[in-house]
Amino acid sequence: MSVTATPDMATPRAAGPTRHAWMGPALVVVAVALLAGWSVFYARTSLAELPLYFAGRFLVIDATSLLFLLLVNAVFLGISVYMSSRVSTSRVLADKLLPRSALTLAFMLAMNLGLMANHLLLLWAFIELTTLCLAPLVAQGDGPAPRRVAWHYLLYSSMSLALTFLGLMCLTRSAQLQGIEMSFMLDEMTVAIPSAGDSWQRLGLALMLFGMGSKLGLAPLYAWLPETYETAPTSTSALLAAVQFNISIVMVLRVLQVFRGHDTGFVAHELLIMGCLSLTVAAVQVMATRNYKRLIAYASVASSGVIAIGLSVGRAAAYGVLLYVVSNAFVKSLLFLTAGRLRAVYGTNETAPLAGVIRVLPFSGALFAVGTFALLGFPPFGGFMAEMLILSGIVQAGNLVAFTLMCTMLTIIFVATGRTLFPMLWNPPAQHRPPVRETWLTALPKLGFVTALVLLGLYTPAPISALLVQVAQSIGGR
C-alpha cells in the first residue's frame, strides 16, 4: 500500500517501534476506568440524592457535574482509542507519545476536578490549568508556526480568564457595599446574593460572561479558535472542541444557576448579541474558507453562537441547549478525528487537492460525510432535534429577530459547507488512487460517536433525558 504522507503523518512502516508504546493502551485503560466509574456511580445513585459534597464542600456532584463528567469522559475514551491506534502509523505521535499522554492525563484530571468544583474561583483555576496542559500540545502541531499559535492560544485564554476574574472581583465589591460576606461557594452564593443587584453586580456578571464567551469562541474574541483548531494535532483539536469547551459551558451554567431569579435581563441581551454576532461571523468565514479543518473550527464558532442565543432565551430553550451541547461534543470529535485521517493520507488541510475521498478512503469518507450531515443539523441526529427545540423556544420568547437571523445564518452555513466539502468527498479524482486500507480500531470510536448522535436524535435513553431535564431546570428551564 502506498499513500501520500507528510513527515508528521508517516505511513505505518515509517513509524517504527517506540519505547513508550505501552502508553497508548494505558491511556485507553484510564479512559475506560473513568467512564465506567462515573457510569456505575450514576447507575447506583438516584438524582434525588444529589447534590453530594466532598473535600470540605469544595467539590460537588450534582446533575450538572454528573452530566458533563459522563459526556467528557465518553469523548475522551474515543479520543484515547484513536491515539492508541495511530501510534503505529504516525512517527511524530510515536516519538512524542509519553509527553502527549502525560499532558492529556493531566488535562483530564483537571477537567474531572473542575467539573466537580463547588467554588467559582476553584473552577476558574481548573479552567486555567486545562489551558496550560493543552498549550504544549497545540505547539506540537504540524502547521506553519505551531508555537506562535500556541502562544496566541495562551494569550487569548489568559485574557478571557482575566476578564472572568475581574468579574468575580466586581461581585466581591458588590457584596462588600451591601454588607454581605462574600463566599464563592456555589450553594452559599445562591442564598447570599440579594435579588436586587447593584451596578457592581451587573458589571461583574457582564465581565464573567464576556470572558467565558471568548473562551467558548464567541465573537468578538474568537480569533484564537480557527488557527488553534487547525494547527493543533488531531487529538488535541478534538480535546479543545469537545472536552475543554464543555468546562467553559459549565462555568456559564454555574453563573446562571447562582443568579437564577435575579434581575439578569441584561445578561440575556449580552448572550443574545454575542450569539448573533458569532453566527454572522461564522457564516461569512465558512463561505470564504477552503480548508476543511478550519471550516470545522468556524462551525464551532457557529455552535457557540447557537448555544448563546438559546441561553439568552432562558426557560423555553434550556433543554434544547443542553441537548445541543451534548450532540456538539460528539459531532466535533467525529469530524476532527476523521479530518486527522484525511490529513494523514493527503498531507494537506486544503480542499482543492482533494477529490473522490469517499473512493480512496471509503470508511473515513463516509464517516466524514455523516459528520457533516450531523454538523448541518440533518435528522436523525441529535443536533436536528436540539436546533428545533431552540428555535421553538426563541419563537415562544417572542424574539422573531433572533429567530430570523439564526435561520438565515444557519442556511448560509449549510449551503457554504456543502459547496466546500461535498465536491471533496464525491467528485471524481484527477488521477486514480487505489483505496487505502483502514483498520477497525481507528474507526471504532467514530462509530461510537455516530451511534450516540443517532440515539440522541431518535431516542434519548430515559436516564440521560432525566439528567438533561434536571440540569435544564437548574437554569430555569422546564
Language-model regions: role of each:
Residues 63-73, 120-130, 201-214, 263-277, ...:
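Structural signature of hydrophobic alpha-helical transmembrane segments
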Residues 2-102, 469, 473-474:
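Transmembrane helix-loop-helix hairpins at membrane boundaries of multipass inner-membrane proteins
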Residues 219, 332-338, 401-436:
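Predominantly late transmembrane helices and immediately cytosolic-facing juxtamembrane segments
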Residues 99-106, 112-200, 285-350:
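Alpha-helical multi-pass transmembrane bundles of energy-transducing inner-membrane proteins
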Residues 137, 229, 256, 307-316, ...:
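Interfacial segments of multi-pass membrane proteins
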Residues 65-122, 144, 210-214, 241, ...:
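Helix-loop-helix module between adjacent transmembrane segments
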Residues 42-57, 163-222, 249-256, 260-270, ...:
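Juxtamembrane/interfacial segments at transmembrane-helix boundaries in multi-pass membrane proteins
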Residues 16-30, 91-106, 121, 142-163, ...:
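Membrane-interfacial loop-to-helix junctions in multi-pass inner-membrane proteins
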